[in-house]
Swiss-Prot record:
One of its GO terms (cellular component) is dendrite. Highly expressed in brain (at protein level). In brain, expressed in the hippocampus, granule cells and interneurons of the cerebellum, and mitral cells of the olfactory bulb (at protein level). Detected in the spinal cord and in peripheral dorsal root ganglia (at protein level). In the retina, strongly expressed in the retinal ganglion layer and, to a lesser extent, in the inner margin of the inner nuclear layer with expression also detected in the inner and outer plexiform layers (at protein level). Residues 13-31, 54-63, 187-209 have a biased composition (Low complexity). This is Cytoplasmic polyadenylation element-binding protein 3. The record marks F462, F506 as: Required for RNA-binding activity. SUPFAM superfamilies: RNA-binding domain, RBD. The modification Phosphoserine is found at S194, S197, S291, S419, S420. The keyword Phosphoprotein applies. It comes from Mus musculus.
Length: 716
């Protein structure tokens, strides 16, 4: 039946005429000569069928009989790739006026069918121009498998895109007269809309240059392409709707040689996947024939994210799940309608992963049991305690040297305005014991090493901003819940007052664990700790709690330089909130060459006494510092002018006699003048400073509390 449908009148009429001529020749051969008797079985000449007689048509073989144009047995060719998608082919010869040909009634041999037609013209009979059929057929593996060429750009949801300007090239002159307009009954087949796009109005303003494809014509176009152009023009003139206009202009369903919307006449079949002008054969176009707004393949282009970055505390994987998907789930859409591909600039996931690693490393600091070697220690901890503490005459006990913690934890998650990944900032070499006012998040019970308690905080705590009417008993009652304590303030014994005179006091706890409990109960605001205290007239007034972290007493800036007491200065009147790291930064900014800074603390309570020391790595910086005599300390809320003196030791021998004249005793005097800068015993000082120009030098002696002072020298 399919072979019957593929035959055309143009092929059957010459066959019928040839058979009629053969019958006439046979009749002439069988006709008797004049005067002979006629055989009874020979038909008369009057009974010979005429070509014009309609009775000759049934006499033909069933294989050569064409179907009636408008008969009841008329069938329509369906697509072998898409069932239900029919084609209509206007005949190449003009039909009689009384019998208009319906679309799809017959198909010409030039129509490229995937079925064998038995013809010998491979170019005209192939479904796609330029591919030779195999045994009258064409292999389907020649087509891309991931995109069906049935759905061309005209069948996409953007079917209403204007593409008229790409068909301005006039078709070659047709050898046959143009077809008349299609009858009205053929239009309903073109009125079908895509269910995905009920209206094409929003896409009417899109330029056809962005989505259309210029047809590539061959040097020898077939006659069927001319018929297609003529039929398209006729259909465009008779169409009334916008859909009909786009359909007829694109000739998607009315062109006999171009029945598929994604193909043009004479085009290389491998370019049927939406190849633009200038694109090589076999290269997929960046436009998808299903939808021009989408790409048919996964893109490797990294798109900038459209949506704001997620919260930094949201735990998720580094890479998106669909970063390397091969289907259309990772398409790059112009408006980012789908989840974006992997963005290398999207660093919030990496930061979360690093924070999780740091949080895991810091778990031992949150109340867990420590190994026998002690808690983790930073490199600055070990560097200072193992390399420099002995030279300064300071004895520290250092547990945890076997368990080194590389990252500083003193301000992890506590200090506002800093990155949790880089907590060092100005204290980049500070150890891991925590900030004095920022340690509540890292507080833990007192560390123990072989049964020996290791303290983290001074047992003396500053409390500021107290209510003016609060007395000693009320202060004690407010903080007694943390442990036994004594309330003190400056000149308390002499004042004989029960109220702190300046609104601040000191809490002297009996146990260091009480200080840690107090820190845990405080609230943090802008890097400071507060606790609510009530008085007879004021209820729940926030007061500032300022503990002193023992690790803030010393800071090593340059561990490669040895500490020389002859290059160390004494800084008096240092504000108590100032830490060693801040003192080192100020001095290094002023004079340079700072390798160590320390805060003098009380030997019993280990609370700052208001003085500090700074060691330099070179003589020039040391002389510049002591020559200035005064320096302005400015840091945050601190702005104070302090005095600078040479740091005097009490265990130095005389630099002149090396103890020979004083019986091996330590030198009691130190000359701070830049022309001397030496230790002298009494005999050597008298002999050296009796010379001209040195009689006005004043000696420095070390008094209690490591504070040097000038003393008058008594001449004998």
């Amino acid at each position: 039946m399919q072979d019957d449908l593929l035959m055309d009148k143009s092929k059957t009429q010459p066959q019928s005429q040839q058979q009629q001529r053969q019958q006439q020749q046979q009749q002439q051969q069988l006709q008797p000569e004049p005067g002979a008797a006629e055989a009874p079985s020979t038909p008369l000449s009057s009974e010979i069928p005429k070509p014009e007689d309609s009775s000759a048509v049934p006499a033909l073989s069933p294989a050569s009989a064409p179907p009636a144009p408008n008969g009841p047995d008329k069938m329509q060719m369906e697509s072998p790739l898409l069932p239900g998608l029919s084609f209509h082919q206007p005949p190449q010869q003009p039909p009689p006026p009384q019998e208009p040909t319906a679309p799809g009634a017959s198909l010409s041999p030039s129509f490229g069918s995937t079925w064998s037609t038995g013809t010998t013209n491979a170019v005209e009979d192939s479904f796609f121009q330029g591919i030779t059929p195999v045994n009258g057929t064409m292999l389907f593996q020649n087509f891309p498998h991931h995109v069906n060429p049935v759905f061309g750009g005209t069948f996409s949801p953007q079917i209403g895109l204007a593409q008229t300007q790409h068909h301005q090239q006039p078709p070659p002159p047709a050898p046959q007269p143009p077809q008349p307009a299609q009858p009205p009954q053929a239009q309903p087949s073109q009125q079908r809309r895509s269910p995905a796009s009920p209206s094409q109005a929003p896409y009417a303003q899109r330029s056809a240059a962005a989505y259309g494809h210029q047809p590539i014509m061959t040097s020898k176009p077939s006659s069927s392409s001319a018929v297609a152009a003529a039929a398209a023009a006729a259909a465009a003139s008779s169409a009334s709707s916008s859909w009909n206009t786009h359909q007829s202009v694109n000739a998607a369903w009315s062109a006999p040689s171009n029945p598929w919307g994604g193909l043009q006449a004479g085009r290389d079949p491998r370019r049927a996947v939406g190849v633009g002008v200038g694109v090589g054969v076999g290269v997929p176009s960046p436009l998808n024939p299903i939808s021009p707004l989408k790409k048919p393949f996964s893109s490797n282009v990294i798109a900038p994210p459209k949506f704001p970055r997620a919260a930094p505390l949201t735990s998720k994987s580094w890479m998106e799940d669909n970063a390397f998907r091969t289907d259309n789930g990772n398409n790059l859409l112009p408006f980012q309608d789908r989840s974006r591909p992997y963005d290398t600039f999207n660093l919030h996931s990496l930061e979360n992963s690093l924070m999780d690693m740091i949080r895991t490393d810091h778990e031992p600091l949150k109340g867990k049991h420590y190994p026998n070697s002690g808690p983790p220690m930073s490199f600055a901890d070990i560097m200072w305690r193992n390399h420099f503490a002995g030279r300064m005459g300071i004895n520290f006990h250092h547990p945890g040297t076997d368990n080194i913690m590389a990252l500083n934890t003193r301000s992890y998650g506590r200090r506002r305005g800093r990155s949790s990944l880089f907590p060092f900032e100005d204290a980049f070499l500070d150890d891991s014991h925590g900030d004095q006012a920022l340690s509540s998040g890292l507080s833990s019970p007192t560390r123990c090493q072989n049964g020996e308690r290791v303290e983290r905080y001074s047992r003396k705590v500053f409390v500021g901003g107290l209510p003016p009417d609060i007395d000693e008993d009320e202060i004690t009652a407010s903080f007694r819940r943390f442990g036994p304590l004594v309330v003190d303030w400056p000149h308390k014994a002499e004042s004989k007052s029960y109220f702190p005179p300046k609104g601040y006091a000191f809490l002297l706890f009996q146990e260091e664990s009480s200080v840690q409990a107090l820190i845990d109960a405080c609230l943090e605001e802008d890097g400071k700790l507060y606790l609510c205290v009530s008085s007879p007239t004021i209820k729940d007034k926030p007061v500032q709690i300022r503990p002193w972290n023992l690790s803030d007493s010393d800071f090593v800036m340059d561990g490669s330089q040895p500490l020389d007491p002859r290059k160390t200065i004494f800084v008096g009147g240092v504000p108590r909130p100032l830490r060693a790291v801040e003192l080192a930064m100020i001095m290094d900014r002023l004079y340079g060459g700072v390798c160590y800074a320390g805060i003098d603390t009380d030997p019993e309570l280990k609370y700052p006494k208001g003085a500090g020391r700074v060691a330099f790595s070179n003589q020039q910086s040391y002389i510049a510092a002591i020559s200035a005599r005064f320096v302005q300390l400015q840091h945050n809320d601190i702005d104070k002018r302090v005095e600078v003196k040479p740091y005097v030791l009490d265990d130095q021998m005389c630099d002149e006699c090396q103890g020979t004249r004083c019986g091996g005793k330590f030198a009691p005097f130190f000359c701070a003048n830049v022309t001397c800068l030496q230790y002298y015993c009494e005999y050597c000082w008298a002999s050296i400073h009796s010379r001209a120009g040195r009689e006005f030098h004043k000696p420095l002696v070390k008094e209690g509390g490591d504070r040097p002072r000038h003393v008058p020298f008594r001449w004998s």
